[in-house]
Amino acid sequence: MRNLKKKSRRGFTLIEVLIVVVILGILASTVLPQFAASTANAKESALRADLSQMRSQIGLYRFQHDGNLPSGTATNVANQLTMATDINGNAAQPGTAGYAYGPYLIGQLPANPYNGGNGILVKAANISSADVDPTAMQGTVKVGWIFSTVSGQIIANSLGNAASGPALSSL
């Protein structure tokens, strides 16, 4: 007599697959909004950290340069913050004789996390949220920051509100 073995079936039924898909859909609908909120909070935190760093370095520049702020064109201000400077604010490569101050920021200005720009718009006047234009360009560089050579104030060149409520340009 022949021995008949039952074939075992492997795999999942259609119902089992559908149940798993429904469960994954429910999980995704509850988890994805939390990731979106985390992204907004991370952008705000990055913006606050960048502004804090730049403000403290501008304060250090002012202290080391006898009360004078970075000044001149956008290129001059960026160079005064990212290169070595002399007491008069002239910029040169770090290590150049006679240029004992700075660099205050390593490399280049940080990118604004909301518009991606790392250029700086320099105003010889006080600045406010009315100066914000997130589409502003300086040649091929997007403007991420607005700086006043009068007050030393620096703000984000971003419209809208932070996740915590205040206007981005007022952080």
Q: How would you name each of these model-derived features?
A:
Residues 124-171:
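Short, surface-exposed interaction loops/tails
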Residues 89, 109-113, 159-163:
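Acidic glycine-/aspartate-rich tracts in secreted/extracellular proteins
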Residues 40-51, 67-68:
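Membrane-proximal amphipathic alpha-helices
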Residues 12-21:
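N-terminal signal-anchor/signal peptide hydrophobic helix marking the start
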Residues 58-106:
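Short, glycine/small-hydrophobic-rich surface segments
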Residues 24-41, 62:
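C-terminal juxtamembrane segment of a hydrophobic transmembrane alpha-helix
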Residues 1-12:
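N-terminal leader/signal peptides at the extreme start of proteins
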